[in-house]
């Protein structure tokens, strides 16, 4: 494939971003969980809204005579049920986040299926650009090589920009909340001081009247 003039101009930038993007934005991660015979293990991630989440999970059974099964539940920050499976050895869940916050995936071993041994689970958790099926995109749009890599990097840069905006909005929200809290604390302090002054004045008047009645002053 011949490189066009535009592609030649973009290549140095793409080459630089190829090293910067993995550092600046998480692209996905594999998680290993050791689930005890009784109890629950969970993984979570702070994700903004309108982000694609894709995850595969699989039981790794090496020292079990019978393949154990697990139950899985995925919930949103507001407690909405996004994925719920029982008595499975593997599975997948995918969704687009509707709200910003902490998304939680919990796993627990089904009773009498594990022989009182820990159950090992491998979880491939991907979000944002890492969840895209680039092979299908390349096939559908007939792109390959450097052009495909540039498309990936453009998506990564866009994701970074969205993350920066999300962090700025969170910072602004936290600043507003902090200012409101400081204002409330200031008013509470003023009110407390006013109450103390009023109580002190009442005590002075009461003692003055008491001493006058006793003819001590």
Curated annotation (Swiss-Prot):
Record: glycosylation sites: 87, 118
Coiled coil: 138-160
Classification via SMART domains: EMP24_GP25L
Membrane topology: Single-pass type I membrane protein
PROSITE patterns cross-referenced by the UniProt entry: GOLD
GO annotation, biological process: protein transport; vesicle-mediated transport
Subcellular localization: Endoplasmic reticulum membrane
Motif COPII vesicle coat-binding boundaries: 210-211
GO cellular component: endoplasmic reticulum membrane
Cleavable signal peptide: 1-30
Lumenal side: 31-184
Residue(s) carrying Omega-N-methylated arginine: 170, 175
Keywords from the UniProt entry: Coiled coil, Endoplasmic reticulum, ER-Golgi transport, Glycoprotein, Membrane, Methylation, Protein transport, Signal, Transmembrane, Transmembrane helix, Transport
TM helices/strands, residue ranges: 185-205
Motif, COPI vesicle coat-binding: chain positions: 210-217
Domain GOLD: residue ranges: 40-152
Residue intervals annotated with topology Cytoplasmic: 206-217
Domain notes: The cytoplasmic C-terminal domain contains a functional dilysine-retrieval motif, which is involved in the retrograde Golgi-to-ER transport of the protein.
Family: Belongs to the EMP24/GP25L family.
Role: Involved in vesicular protein trafficking. Mainly functions in the early secretory pathway. Thought to act as cargo receptor at the lumenal side for incorporation of secretory cargo molecules into transport vesicles and to be involved in vesicle coat formation at the cytoplasmic side.
Subunit structure: Probably oligomerizes with other members of the EMP24/GP25L family. Associates with the COPI vesicle coat (coatomer). Associates with the COPII vesicle coat (coatomer).
Protein name: Transmembrane emp24 domain-containing protein p24delta3
Organism: Arabidopsis thaliana (Mouse-ear cress)
């Amino acid at each position: 494939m011949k490189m066009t003039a535009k592609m030649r101009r973009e290549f140095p930038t793409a080459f630089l971003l190829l090293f910067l993007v993995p550092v600046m934005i998480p692209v996905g991660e594999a998680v290993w969980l050791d689930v005890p015979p009784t109890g629950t293990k969970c993984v979570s991630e702070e994700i903004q809204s309108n982000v694609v989440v894709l995850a595969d999970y699989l039981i790794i059974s090496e020292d079990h005579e019978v393949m154990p099964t697990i139950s899985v539940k995925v919930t949103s920050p507001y407690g909405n049920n996004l994925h719920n499976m029982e008595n499975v050895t593997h599975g997948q869940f995918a969704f687009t986040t509707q709200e910003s916050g902490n998304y939680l995936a919990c796993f627990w071993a089904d009773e009498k299926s594990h022989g009182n041994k820990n159950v090992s689970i491998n979880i491939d958790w991907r979000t944002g650009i890492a969840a895209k099926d680039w092979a299908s995109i390349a096939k559908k749009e007939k792109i390959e090589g450097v052009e495909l890599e540039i498309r990936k990097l453009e998506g990564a840069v866009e994701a970074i920009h969205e993350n920066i905006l999300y962090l700025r909005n969170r910072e602004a929200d936290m600043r507003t909340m902090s200012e409101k809290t400081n204002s409330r604390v200031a008013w509470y302090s003023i009110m407390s001081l006013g109450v103390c002054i009023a109580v002190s004045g009442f005590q002075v008047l009461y003692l003055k009247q008491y001493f006058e009645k006793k003819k001590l002053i």
